[in-house]
Curated annotation (Swiss-Prot):
A biological-process GO annotation: coenzyme A biosynthetic process
Signal peptide (from-to): none
Lineage: Bacteria, Pseudomonadati, Pseudomonadota, Gammaproteobacteria, Pseudomonadales
GO CC annotation: cytoplasm
Sorted UniProt keywords: ATP-binding, Coenzyme A biosynthesis, Cytoplasm, Kinase, Nucleotide-binding, Transferase
EC number: 2.7.1.24
Protein localization: Cytoplasm
The DPCK domain, residue ranges: 5-202
Official protein name in the record: Dephospho-CoA kinase
Pathway assigned to this chain's UniProt record: Cofactor biosynthesis; coenzyme A biosynthesis; CoA from (R)-pantothenate: step 5/5
InterPro entries tied to this protein: Depp_CoAkinase, P-loop_NTPase
Chain's gene name: coaE
Source species: Stutzerimonas stutzeri
EC category name: transferase
Binding site for ATP: 13-18
Primary localisation category: cytoplasm
Length: 202
């Protein structure tokens, strides 16, 4: 039977990585949309050639890899260029994700993405799990992890879907504000529940 897909998301500092890694330890196949976004622009991939052709060789490093910082600066303040890039990459990323998910041997597979809601990736999922956390803890974790200021983290939060919007799409919510042992037990509980589902439905 084809595995059903669980979409997993949460804001910066919510602990998505810790949650999905714990599912992985329980034998669940998972794919990170951020990794897929990197795979489609690796050297030798058609998308990288298209990007270099469109923006010029300045977006490549001397080794022929994509210089993300340069590209980000080019598209950050130019909505038209950002749209062009999204129209090129989003279908390729979706395809890459679908290919990796189709290889799953587990009863369900996980698509983890910080932009699950914003990029419409939740449409690839049968069920959505949101990792939620109080904002004060979110700021504290993200500032510590990224060595960033509160203003920088707040700017990232503004660019992401609001907490309310994420929760509106959620079938399940995991509030990740306790210790590691609690998190492991909560993931195990959700995993047991997910094993009883077919196509993401009870």
């Amino acid at each position: 039977m084809k595995p059903w897909i669980l979409g997993l998301t949460g804001g910066i500092g919510s602990g998505k990585s810790a949650v999905v890694e714990q599912f992985g330890r329980l034998g669940v196949h998972w794919v990170d949309a951020d990794h897929a976004a990197r795979w489609v622009v690796e050297p030798g991939k058609p998308a990288l050639a298209r990007i270099a052709e469109h923006f010029g060789d300045g977006v490549l490093t001397p080794a022929g890899e994509l210089d993300r910082a340069v590209l980000r600066a080019r598209v950050f303040e130019n909505a038209g260029e950002r749209r062009w890039l999204e129209q090129l990459l989003h279908p390729l990323i979706r395809q890459e994700i679908a290919e990796h998910l189709s290889r799953a041997q587990s009863p369900y597979a996980i698509l983890v993405s910080p932009l699950l809601i914003e990029a419409g990736q939740y449409r690839q999922a049968d069920r959505v799990l949101v990792v939620d956390v109080p904002e004060s803890l979110q700021l504290q974790r993200a500032m510590r992890r990224d060595q960033a200021s509160e203003a920088q983290i707040r700017a990232i939060l503004k660019a992401q879907a609001s907490r309310e919007e994420r929760l509106r799409h959620a079938d399940d919510v995991l509030v990740n504000d306790r210790d590691r042992a609690w998190l492991e037990a909560e993931v195990a509980r959700l995993h047991d529940f997910y094993l009883t589902l077919r196509g993401g439905q009870p």
